[in-house]
């Protein structure tokens, strides 16, 4: 007999936004503060963005496809952009995964400051890229 657990059971009936808020609170340190800050900037850049909770605990922001994920590690918070290699980055905000053909990432460490304007520009560019791919 195979026991299947539904998503509702795993998430205890909570919305992805609630789960992301809980993750931020659980972290309880600079990583939670950083995740909260980038979440706020993402929502400011794209008020229509959808928050999702995937892969057993990874916050995901989507609009016409995945824009980015927000993973927290012991030493840093990683924002991975699914199609980051196709996004222009004139400010050099991407600092991880630079050799890949698809993804790019931003690794944020304790004390790092975010170039808010450049970050929002990357979010908008990712949404625009997702939207243009859907229309074809």
How would you name each of these model-derived features?
Residues 1-136:
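Charge-dense, helix-prone N-terminal extensions
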């Amino acid at each position: 007999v195979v026991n299947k657990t539904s998503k509702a059971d795993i998430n205890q009936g909570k919305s992805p936004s609630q789960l992301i808020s809980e993750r931020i609170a659980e972290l309880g340190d600079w990583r939670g503060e950083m995740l909260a800050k980038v979440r706020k900037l993402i929502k400011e850049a794209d008020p229509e963005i959808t928050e999702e909770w995937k892969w057993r605990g990874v916050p995901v922001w989507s609009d016409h496809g995945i824009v980015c994920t927000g993973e927290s590690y012991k030493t840093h918070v990683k924002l991975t952009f699914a199609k980051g290699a196709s996004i222009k980055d004139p400010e050099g905000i991407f600092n991880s995964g630079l050799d890949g053909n698809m993804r790019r990432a931003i690794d944020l460490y304790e004390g790092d400051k975010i170039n808010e304007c450049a970050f929002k520009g990357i979010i908008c560019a990712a949404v625009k890229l997702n939207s243009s791919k859907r229309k074809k």
